[in-house]
Amino acid sequence: MRLNARDLRALWDLPRLRAAACGYFGHMWELYAFWAVVPALCLTIAASPANPAPALWSGWLAATVIGAGALGCIVGGYLARRMGSARVACAALGGSGLICLVYPLLPESMSGLRLAALLLWGVLVVADSPQFSALSAQAAPPQLLGLALVLQNGIGFLISVISIVLLSALMDFWGARALWLLAPGPLLGLWAMRGQLGRSRPCFNKED
């Protein structure tokens, strides 16, 4: 497949595809950077005088937080069949963005609350991913579908590399407050999707 400016312009000129792709980019700014620092966040929770093996427990906690995303994807898929992918994607993106803003404000002494917030964050942070992919697949013309998804995923992972590097560096200086670096992703993603909620339909209905 040849990449040419005409195809790129044709894809960018599709409002629904542009909104879904930009929403996905905001999601990718947050997702992998969050996963990258989950072990460090869990180690802070597990580190206490009463815990003789904080490293071991933090590993189990981190795996649980990241694995909780599977539940988010399953529930998100179920809800998308009734509410539409755009609504589910925006709800998950907004929820994870809200936790991103609130989590650094939680006292370190409230380890149970912090763990609950991380688990909920783990559920929400990835639940929008398949929905954005579905929205893009529905919006792209068949002859450019492969190109649209390749570009969306490639740009998304490039964005992830940047956010991972920045967040990992800032965590050493700011601790949990560095998580605020992730907030622009969900916020910009929601802004990009602002005109799509009214058009969201259940997935079992044929799109226009």
Spans of features found by a protein language model:
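Juxtamembrane intracellular "pre-TM" segments in multi-pass secondary transporters
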Residues: 1-22
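Extracytoplasmic gate region of multi-pass secondary transporters
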Residues: 16-70, 74
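A membrane-interface helix-boundary motif in multi-pass transporters
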Residues: 52-55, 167-186
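Helix-to-loop junctions at the C-terminal end of transmembrane segments
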Residues: 72-85, 171-172
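C-terminal transmembrane helical hairpin of 12-TM major facilitator-type secondary transporters
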Residues: 84-135
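Multi-pass alpha-helical transporter architecture, strongest
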Residues: 104-107, 176-208
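A late C-terminal transmembrane helix in Major Facilitator Superfamily
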Residues: 137-174
